């Protein structure tokens, strides 16, 4: 099952910046697996953002497990890191779209 998110260039930039994991901490096997998956999502989001040539909306495709992990990651990040109004609104919109399609 695949999930599609329709994003503008600015929204794709927010997603690419938020999905980037700076300094991972590995305490167990589960965290190493999650980091590996998030790294794949980060690469996919960054390539999607870099592929924009104009400000039109494009579809960003994720597999169900990638979308689920991204939703959990964004939810956790919003609780820990403070973002501006536009970034928070964009991240909540992405979480809502993922939740609607996975439900």
PLM features: what roles do these ranges have?
Residues 1-103:
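Positively charged, low-complexity terminal tracts
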